[in-house]
């Protein structure tokens, strides 16, 4: 039929037998013309529909668009001309074939369609159509045959159809021009990422990334150089898609979980029924015990399962499908190579075959390899981006869950464990996603390999398959063991990171008590277990590697042996051998990768379980908190009962309470009565038992322990709200922050560090209050905000913020307070006891009622006046039953004596006192400066010296220094390195030997052609080939074992050095370095050194030697190939140099941008109640998304850089294959089939090996960055040695005499002095009180005594010994401190008291008795073994402070420092601590940093500090008599003489004798 259509022959059946490759003209004019046209017309409707759906605003006409349209227009004109020529041809000639009419008409219509498509693309972001590019490529390729036919026809006959030929040549040229134009992309200003607008050719070759690589080569890349990720990869887009499917799948999983629970319940019921009339069986007891343990630990083995993987699949199924198709095409094309190799060997072996066939085979080899490269790299790009998306999804979802998780579920996880979910577990899922298709792909490749091997060798291949099958269960057993080891290791890692988190959080306490060695041992012990598992895992992996490496060798040896042994006529020739070897090489990859993928999947399954358990945990149930904007009351409790744990009794019980809008309500009660729980219930932080709470309007919350974000003071106060300068200034003034801003460098733009590390407790609390005040909410929940400020500041804040005339006047305020003198000014008082409301009413009504509140209040006033210490009302309180004077009495009490839970706060004490005459002028000046600052934020270079407390994370640039590699190699050990290299070299020798031996074996087919093959020769060939194969496996096993041992040793050394150095770093390092940044070294970087780096080093060594071996073998066969290697090597090296510079820096950027994600997460978890109260979850989610997107743009860029490199390397590899094949064709007369097979079978491997080599080079350099980052912290400057040769005498200090001589100190070299020439003598057993405002130098004095700060000048001597001359532990171990913040660590109570086990149980119990904790600890279930949780939430602040007192009592050193030790405790606890100190430390030198003047009035001497100088120093009597700063402070506190302070002793006696009821400490 087609013959008639063309009037010529359609197909020539003897084409392959002709000396010239010439397709029939009819075939060229029909099939080769129609293929591209059919492709275009089939896809055009779908393309136009897609354009219609995704169209955006039409872009302006560009030169590219015009050029392409003009060229297509020219093609249209040429088609018209051709049609006219056909129609006007001489009718006298022979009949014109139909094809001459149809082709121009088809082209005419097609070019019109192309014009339409190109025009429609102008309304899309992507102007170039990928399918149009494919059409042009197909059209040009198909036209090539017609092009060469016309050329040859014209050369034979110059007048043959010249016009038609010219039209074709012009059309062909235009098509090439259009394809060239299509390779360039038209820029779109709406897109920041060029990948969005990149052309098809640019995308498949990753050429759009060239500019980044060039930039990275010229200079180190910065974050600004990296393009933003495309919208589809952003966290918000991905998570929104993920959550839709997650909701459905989680719902199904929960139903399945409930069914499992019901079945278990029924089974247990039956079990109990069987044992009803018998004593409980052992099994039931064990079951019950297990339940108890699970309940206690907060963990359950069962939870909603198997939903996460389904959700991920449903979210990303399109990417999975596309990547599946690409991998399928790649795998199928892989099996064309052995067939082409076979054809080439046949071609060389047959001297009669035509040369053009050889060239066609060589070109086909190159074409197949090129298509494979495009498919593989696009596949990898998709999969790695998918992995990145999965990682993004996990991190964002875990963060979002953390914002909604219930408190009960949250308690099951430490912060370290949750961070691990975001880092380690997310990474495991990313890794497995990258190679998920290898599961089915490996199976497909194995099956196809076996099939093609059967075709070559027949049933003999079954012997090889049998070997593979036998090894499957072995690999399965090893994989299972590896999973268990991995699971254990994750637990050890979690524990280690938890301890590290605590160490870093409580570093100052460790240094004060010289406890670093104890905690170092704890970490080392866990690390030993971790490394033991790591070694076992590495050894198991070595065995797996050995089996994987040996399997293809065993299979090939077995198969070849059986093939030649079963039939004497079976002789192994080059065709069979090298085709089979190529198939065995194909088989090697899936065989080696499948167990790795299975192992990765097993590891990922552990992570999936952990993530499913966390993400399926219960959310905070706020259904009991009803918000009604039209409600007539501000807050209403209706029969409300709430609990922290449903397994425990309710903490808040049957509360009925109405609070009207605008009221100021004080909540008072005993310690542990439920005041804070009542506030938490209102915030929805507790589990509802029954009843509900109705709230009208928005809430703001000030927690008891202030939560400060790492940022500026201004950011903390604004808390995401719009900046209103007038309100902002009012808030600063009302919260008494203006004087503090004057002290701080940079004012409100000063960075205040992680957790507000460089602020006092009072400053943090006032910033917390300012944050709430600025928000302009309807209801303010204030949990004891005045506890951290002194009396004058408290009064100022109450009057200016909380009180009737304060900033929040008109707002509803619930105030938990311990300050009696404010109670008369509140609208209502709520008295809480044991979770219930005892009384409620106004101050006067409660007094009139004469209930618990009035009774305790009168008792307080009576005992105060009975001693005659405080005279406030001229005898108006004589009648005990008369309440009329109580209001005035309470109002006129000296605040310093009534405020029962005060914390250090002297900054405003000074600035608000009468001694500050210039206060007004300074405040005005500061306001003006703040206005200037808020109007225009200073640039970074304008920031005041010392303003930026948190240093920007240091990032190396350029090549990783050789010293880093050297450090790692030294850590491995030079003996191990030599052994590893030697083993791998032997492996390469065995590899070359086995190939040469196989080549010699196949040449036997020529030697013994037609004759009997000697059995001895056959056996020799088999034996040596088998020995060489076994040698390859054994050398890999030895190298892997040696490497595993050496790398584990290196990991141990680096971790040990890092830990030792971090523990020895000065406090200034921790003050300027966020904890998350340090933890990242112990988590991510150590994990890289443990797992990834050893693997990449091993792979690099194997790839490098494999390439050298292959090139040696090719050059041995064809020496001329050495000439081609040189230019290819230059290209290879150039590409690598360009790539490595970029990749290395991108990896560094990845590390630097990852730390803030974890820091932000840790910060969020610690401030959850505040974030929820302000309803700022969405803002924090957005911040997290921005952080993730910033990190992921570095990851995405790194992924693209890998693909950019791989494509170019594979191109080099493909050129090696093409060059080798070309050489075989050119020199076929001098080569034999076995040489061709030998060369090409190895050349086919080089593409993949080259790719892996550069990837491993990059991976190694990328991963060695972890060693670089660890080394950075190993090199951190240490504080002084813990122990020196000069040690103090035994029993030192025996007196406790301290002398400061012209002592000067500064916090950091670039900062000013904080102590400026301190001179004073403290005699033995003296009691010294130290006072002064914030910034005066009080805490600095303490830090100097412990050498937390080192002297900038002068010296301190204790008992005649200069403390700078002895070791830090010799010094700190002999001093004792009770710090302001009572820090405890996870572990037992005993460990917290005595981490070194230096004391007996009797001594510890005695210390607890003196600390008034014996009965409490004895009453605990496990006594001294009772575990303290990470957040210390199972002990009150008072109990923690008493434990700190217990530490001091155990030490019983001659010098005791009280750094505002009773600042955060109530009167009872304060009294207990003060009494114990007076009794037990009477023979010691005691230095007290004062928060209340009354506590230091019985001191021998008072030291008044101001601006780093001692302004007064003398006995209290002397200082009160002089008209100095201390005298003014005392008068303001109501102290006129030393005897005035007897109030405290009286109150203490009453409380101790039981004459004061517990309410005394609570009506506060």
UniProtKB/Swiss-Prot annotation:
* EC numbers: 7.6.2.-, 7.6.2.2, 7.6.2.3
Keywords (A to Z) from UniProt: ATP-binding, Cell membrane, Glycoprotein, Lipid transport, Membrane, Nucleotide-binding, Phosphoprotein, Repeat, Translocase, Transmembrane, Transmembrane helix, Transport
Where, per the database record, does this protein carry Phosphoserine?
Answer: 279, 281, 876, 925, 929, 1436
Q: Gene3D superfamilies recorded for this chain?
A: ABC transporter type 1, transmembrane domain, P-loop containing nucleotide triphosphate hydrolases
Binding residues for ATP 2, per the UniProt record?
A: 1332-1339
Region Disordered: start and end of each range?
A: 258-283, 909-939
Gene Ontology BP terms: bile acid and bile salt transport; leukotriene transport
Topological region Extracellular: 1-27, 90-93, 148-165, 333-358, 457-459, 564-585, 991-1031, 1117, 1231-1232
**Chief subcellular location:** membrane
The Polar residues compositionally biased stretches are 268-283
Q: What class of enzyme is it?
A: translocase
Q: Which residues are glycosylated?
A: 7, 12, 1009
Query: Cytoplasmic topology: which positions?
Result: 49-68, 115-126, 187-311, 380-435, 481-542, 607-969, 1053-1095, 1139-1209, 1254-1543
List the expressing tissues. Answer: Expressed in liver, kidney and small intestine.
- What range(s) does the ABC transmembrane type-1 domain occupy? 320-603, 977-1262
GO cellular component assignments: apical plasma membrane
- Catalytic activity from the UniProt record: an S-substituted glutathione(in) + ATP + H2O = an S-substituted glutathione(out) + ADP + phosphate + H(+); ATP + H2O + xenobioticSide 1 = ADP + phosphate + xenobioticSide 2; taurolithocholate 3-sulfate(in) + ATP + H2O = taurolithocholate 3-sulfate(out) + ADP + phosphate + H(+); leukotriene C4(in) + ATP + H2O = leukotriene C4(out) + ADP + phosphate + H(+)
Pfam family, any one: ABC_tran
Q: Which residues of the sequence carry a binding annotation for ATP 1?
A: 669-676
- SMART domains in alphabetical order: AAA (SM00382)
Stretches of Low complexity bias are at 909-918
The UniProt transmembrane annotation reads: 28-48, 69-89, 94-114, 127-147, 166-186, 312-332, 359-379, 436-456, 460-480, 543-563, 586-606, 970-990, 1032-1052, 1096-1116, 1118-1138, 1210-1230, 1233-1253
Family per record: Belongs to the ABC transporter superfamily. ABCC family. Conjugate transporter (TC 3.A.1.208) subfamily.
Described by its record, this protein's role is as follows: ATP-dependent transporter of the ATP-binding cassette (ABC) family that binds and hydrolyzes ATP to enable active transport of various substrates including many drugs, toxicants and endogenous compound across cell membranes. Transports a wide variety of conjugated organic anions such as sulfate-, glucuronide- and glutathione (GSH)-conjugates of endo- and xenobiotics substrates. Mediates hepatobiliary excretion of mono- and bis-glucuronidated bilirubin molecules and therefore play an important role in bilirubin detoxification.
The protein's name in its UniProt record: ATP-binding cassette sub-family C member 2
This chain is encoded by the gene named ABCC2
């Amino acid at each position: 039929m087609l013959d008639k259509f063309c009037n010529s022959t359609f197909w020539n059946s003897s084409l392959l037998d002709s000396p010239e490759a010439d397709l029939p003209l009819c075939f060229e004019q029909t099939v080769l013309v129609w293929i591209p046209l059919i492709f275009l017309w089939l896809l055009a409707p779908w393309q136009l529909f897609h354009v219609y759906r995704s169209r955006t605003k039409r872009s302006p006409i560009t030169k590219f668009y015009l050029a392409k349209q003009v060229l297509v227009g020219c093609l249209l004109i040429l088609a018209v001309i051709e049609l006219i020529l056909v129609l006007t041809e001489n009718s006298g000639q022979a009949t014109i074939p139909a094809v001459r009419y149809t082709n121009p008409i088809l082209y005419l219509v097609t070019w019109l369609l192309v014009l339409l498509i190109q025009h429609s693309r102008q309304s899309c972001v992507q102007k170039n159509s990928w399918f149009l590019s494919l059409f042009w490529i197909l059209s040009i390729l198909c036209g090539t045959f017609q092009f060469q036919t016309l050329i040859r026809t014209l050369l034979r006959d110059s007048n043959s159809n010249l016009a038609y030929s010219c039209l074709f040549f012009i059309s062909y040229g235009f098509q090439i021009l259009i394809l060239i134009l299509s390779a360039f992309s038209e820029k779109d200003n709406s897109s920041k990422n060029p990948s969005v607008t990149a052309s098809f050719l640019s995308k498949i070759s990753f050429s759009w990334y060239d500019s980044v690589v060039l930039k990275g080569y010229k200079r180190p890349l910065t974050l600004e150089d990296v393009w933003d990720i495309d919208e589809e990869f952003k966290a918000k887009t991905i998570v929104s898609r993920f959550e839709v499917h997650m909701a459905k799948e989680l719902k199904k999983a929960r139903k399945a979980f409930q069914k499992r629970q019901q079945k278990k319940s029924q089974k247990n019921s039956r079990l109990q029924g069987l044992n009803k009339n018998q004593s409980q069986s052992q099994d039931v007891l064990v079951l019950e015990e297990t339940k108890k343990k699970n309940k206690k630990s907060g963990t359950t083995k069962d939870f909603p399962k198997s939903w996460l993987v389904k959700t991920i699949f449903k979210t990303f199924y399109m990417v999975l499908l596309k990547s599946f198709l690409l991998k399928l095409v790649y795998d199928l094309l892989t099996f064309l190579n052995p067939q082409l190799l076979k054809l080439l060997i046949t071609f060389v072996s047959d001297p009669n075959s035509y040369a053009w066939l050889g060239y066609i085979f060589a070109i086909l080899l190159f074409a197949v390899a090129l298509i494979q490269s495009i498919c593989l790299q696009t596949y990898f790009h998709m999969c790695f981006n998918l992995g990145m998306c999965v990682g993004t999804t996990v991190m964002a979802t875990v963060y979002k869950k953390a914002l909604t998780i219930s408190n009960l579920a949250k308690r099951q996880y430490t912060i370290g464990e949750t961070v691990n979910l975001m880092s380690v577990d997310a990474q495991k899922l990313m890794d497995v996603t990258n190679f998920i298709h290898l599961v089915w792909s490996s199976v497909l490749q194995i099956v196809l390999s076996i099939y093609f091997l059967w075709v070559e060798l027949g049933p003999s291949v079954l012997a090889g398959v049998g070997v593979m099958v036998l090894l499957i269960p072995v690999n399965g057993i090893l994989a299972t063991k590896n999973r268990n080891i991995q699971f254990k290791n994750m637990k050890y890692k979690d524990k280690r990171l938890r301890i590290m988190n605590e160490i870093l959080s409580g570093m100052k306490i460790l240094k004060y008590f010289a406890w670093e060695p104890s905690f170092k041992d704890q970490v080392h012990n866990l690390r030993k277990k971790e490394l033991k598992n790591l070694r076992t895992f590495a050894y198991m992996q070595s065995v797996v590697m050995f089996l994987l490496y040996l399997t293809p060798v065993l299979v090939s040896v077995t198969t070849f042996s059986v093939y030649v042994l079963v039939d004497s006529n079976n002789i192994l020739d080059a065709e069979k051998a090298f085709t089979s070897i190529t198939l065995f090489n194909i088989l090697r990859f899936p065989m080696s990768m499948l167990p790795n993928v299975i192992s990765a999947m097993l590891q990922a399954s552990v992570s999936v379980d952990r993530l499913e358990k966390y993400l399926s945990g219960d959310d905070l149930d706020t259904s009991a908190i009803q918000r009604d904007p039209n409600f007539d009351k501000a807050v209403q409790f209706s029969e409300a009962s709430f609990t922290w744990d449903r397994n425990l009794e309710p903490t808040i019980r049957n509360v009925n309470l109405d609070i009207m809008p605008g009221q100021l309500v004080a909540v008072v009660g005993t310690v542990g009565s439920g005041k804070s729980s009542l506030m938490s219930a209102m915030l929805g932080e507790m589990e509802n038992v029954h009843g509900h709470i109705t709230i009208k309007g928005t809430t703001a919350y000030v927690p008891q322990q202030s939560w400060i974000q790492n940022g500026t003071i201004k950011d903390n106060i604004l808390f995401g709200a719009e900046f209103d300068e007038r309100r902002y200034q009012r808030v600063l003034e009302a919260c008494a922050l203006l004087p503090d801003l004057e002290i701080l460098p940079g004012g409100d733009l000063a960075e205040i560090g992680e957790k507000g590390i460089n602020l006092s407790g009072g400053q943090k609390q006032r910033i917390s209050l300012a944050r709430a005040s600025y928000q302009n909410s309807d209801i303010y929940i204030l949990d004891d905000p005045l506890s951290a400020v002194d009396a004058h500041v408290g009064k100022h804040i109450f009057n200016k913020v909380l009180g009737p005339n304060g900033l929040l006047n008109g707002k509803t305020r619930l105030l938990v307070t311990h300050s009696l003198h404010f109670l008369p000014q509140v609208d209502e008082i709520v008295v809480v006891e044991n979770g219930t409301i005892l009384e409620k009413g106004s101050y006067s009504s409660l007094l009139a009622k004469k209930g618990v509140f009035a009774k305790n209040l009168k008792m307080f006033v009576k005992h105060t006046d009975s001693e005659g210490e405080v005279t406030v009302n001229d005898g108006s309180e004589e009648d005990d039953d008369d309440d009329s004077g109580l209001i005035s009495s309470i109002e006129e009490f000296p605040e310093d004596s009534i405020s029962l839970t005060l914390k250090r706060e002297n900054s405003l004490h000074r600035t608000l006192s009468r001694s500050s005459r210039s206060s007004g002028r300074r405040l005005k000046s500061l306001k003006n400066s703040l206005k200037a600052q808020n109007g225009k934020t200073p640039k970074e270079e304008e920031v005041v010296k010392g303003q930026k407390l948190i240093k920007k994370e240091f990032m190396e640039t350029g090549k990783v220094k050789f010293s880093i590699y050297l450090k790692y190699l030294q850590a491995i050990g030079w003996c191990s390195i030599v052994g590893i290299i030697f083993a791998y070299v032997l492996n390469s020798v065995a590899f070359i030997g086995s190939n040469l031996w196989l080549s010699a074996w196949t040449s036997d087919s020529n030697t013994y052609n037609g004759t009997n093959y000697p059995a001895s020769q056959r056996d020799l060939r088999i034996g040596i080939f088998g020995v060489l194969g076994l040698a390859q496996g054994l050398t890999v096993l030895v190298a892997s074992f040696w490497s595993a041992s050496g790398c584990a040793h290196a990991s141990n050394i680096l971790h040990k050095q890092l830990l030792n150095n971090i523990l020895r770093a000065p406090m200034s390092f921790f003050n300027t370095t966020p904890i998350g940044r340090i933890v990242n070294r112990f988590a991510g970087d150590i994990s890289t050194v443990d797992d990834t780096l050893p693997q990449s080093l091993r792979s690099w060594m194997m790839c490098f030697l494999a390439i050298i071996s292959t090139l040696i073998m090719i050059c041995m066969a064809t020496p001329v190939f050495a000439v081609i290697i040189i230019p290819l090597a230059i290209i290879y090296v150039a590409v690598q140099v360009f790539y490595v510079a970029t990749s290395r820096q991108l990896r560094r950027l990845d590390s630097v941008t990852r730390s803030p994600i974890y820091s932000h997460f840790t910060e969020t978890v610690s401030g959850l109640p505040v974030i929820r109260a302000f309803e700022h979850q969405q803002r924090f989610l957005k911040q997290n998304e921005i952080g993730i997107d910033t990190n992921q743009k570095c990851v995405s860029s790194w992924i693209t850089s890998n693909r950019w490199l791989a494509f170019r390397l594979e191109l080099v590899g493909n050129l090696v294959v093409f060059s080798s094949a070309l050489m075989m064709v050119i020199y076929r007369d001098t080569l034999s089939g076995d040489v061709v097979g030998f060369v090409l079978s190895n050349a086919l491997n080089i593409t993949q090996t080259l790719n892996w080599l550069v990837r491993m080079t990059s991976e190694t350099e990328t991963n060695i960055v972890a060693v670089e980052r660890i080394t950075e912290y190993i090199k951190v400057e240490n504080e002084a040695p813990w122990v020196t040769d000069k040690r103090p005498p035994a029993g030192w200090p025996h007196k406790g005499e301290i002398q400061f001589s012209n002592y000067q100190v500064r916090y950091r070299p670039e900062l000013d002095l904080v102590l400026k020439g301190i001179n004073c003598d403290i005699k033995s057993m003296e009691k010294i009180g130290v006072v002064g405002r914030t910034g005066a130098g009080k805490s600095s004095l303490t830090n100097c005594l412990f050498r937390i700060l080192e002297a900038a000048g002068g010296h301190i001597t204790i008992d005649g010994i200069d403390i700078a001359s002895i070791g830090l532990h010799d010094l700190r171990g002999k001093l004792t401190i009770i710090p302001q913040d009572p820090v405890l660590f996870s572990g037992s109570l005993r460990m917290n008291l005595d981490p070194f086990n230096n004391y007996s149980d009797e001594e510890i119990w005695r210390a607890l008795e003196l600390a008034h904790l014996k009965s409490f600890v004895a009453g605990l279930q496990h006594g001294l073994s009772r575990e303290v949780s990470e957040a210390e939430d199972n002990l009150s602040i008072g109990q923690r402070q008493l434990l700190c007192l217990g530490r001091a009592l155990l030490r019983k050193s001659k010098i005791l420092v009280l750094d505002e030790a009773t600042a955060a405790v109530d009167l009872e606890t304060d009294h207990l601590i003060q009494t114990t100190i007076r009794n037990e430390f009477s023979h010691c030198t005691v230095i007290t940093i004062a928060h209340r003047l009354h506590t230091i009035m019985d001191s021998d001497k008072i030291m008044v500090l101001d601006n780093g100088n001692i302004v007064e120093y003398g006995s209290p009597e002397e200082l009160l008599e002089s008209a100095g700063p201390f005298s003014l402070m005392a008068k303001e506190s109501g102290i006129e003489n030393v005897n005035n302070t007897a109030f405290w002793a009286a109150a203490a006696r009453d409380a101790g004798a039981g004459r004061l009821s517990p309410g005394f400490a609570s009506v506060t």
